[in-house]
């Protein structure tokens, strides 16, 4: 099982560094390889340019895609995960297009986990508090 982490923006780096330090297999995908190397190159050399076709070729059943990319990438990456028998995680809110994938994911025994970011977390806590 490999974790395919996409995106090394400011909000992604602390969690990515922690994950790499656990020793689990992580491949880092980023639009700018140099930026990813600056962020985590001291911890891993498994850094690749973000290319959907390359991710799809590398993806194996049971792998996990973590998307820390802008929201317009989440549904295409989740669909890719489903076709390859992989799981998907993002920090963003659930869009109607993502929700539409739920039945297919459940039928395949796969997890599509969303809303694990700071903003959704604060919203959920505040809603519970109110």
Name every feature range the model reports, one short phrase each.
Residues 42-54:
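Rossmann-fold cofactor-recognition segment
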Residues 80-98:
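ADP-ribose/adenylate-binding Rossmann-like module
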């Amino acid at each position: 099982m490999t974790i395919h982490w996409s995106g090394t923006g400011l909000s992604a780096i602390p969690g990515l560094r922690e994950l790499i330090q656990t020793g689990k297999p992580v491949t880092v995908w980023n639009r700018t390889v140099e930026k990813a190397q600056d962020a985590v190159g001291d911890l891993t050399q498994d850094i690749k340019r973000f290319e959907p076709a390359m991710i799809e070729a590398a993806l194996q059943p049971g792998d996990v895609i973590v998307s820390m990319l802008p929201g317009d990438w989440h549904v295409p990456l989740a669909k890719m995960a489903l076709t390859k028998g992989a799981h998907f995680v993002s920090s963003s809110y659930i869009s109607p297009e993502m929700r539409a994938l739920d039945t297919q994911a459940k039928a395949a025994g796969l997890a599509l986990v969303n809303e694990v970011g700071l903003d959704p977390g604060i919203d959920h806590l505040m809603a519970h508090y109110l």
